[in-house]
Amino acid sequence: DLVRSRGLGDVYKRQYLQYASRESERLRVGEKQTLATSVIASGFPYDKDVNPDNNSDNVARIIPYVRDVRRLGSAAYDISCVAAGLLDGYWELALHEWDVCAAELILAEAGGVVCDLRRDRGISIVAGNGAIVKEILKYVR
């Protein structure tokens, strides 16, 4: 399983039932327990200008409670950054399997969890360590 960021040169890998790595460095999710000190990321659907479920309401709800919200790259890259402890959490709506499959496995090997929001449109997930996922779920719908 592999996630590659061509622009940054990062390569994230998962060794089946062993560990996840970036450039041979073993990955571990961050240990933060609250959103107040957390940097999290999210994304927006390609049709955000006409889609009423465009995630902007979730950003507005959560932003007062976090240290910062970022938008870095693809869903796979952002989830891999959570696996590396570079981000504390991530959520996004209306994704596809190819957006997240490899990164979810990398995150699991790094000790993280993914929660499926089970929405009507595509795959919608929250990712991070267990505590941060629970915190994000208070604000993301």
Question: Whereabouts are the PLM-identified features?
Answer:
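Solvent-exposed alpha-helices and their adjacent loops that cap or buttress functional pockets
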Residues: 5-6, 31-34, 61, 117-120
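A conserved active-site-flanking secondary-structure segment within enzyme catalytic domains
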Residues: 10-36
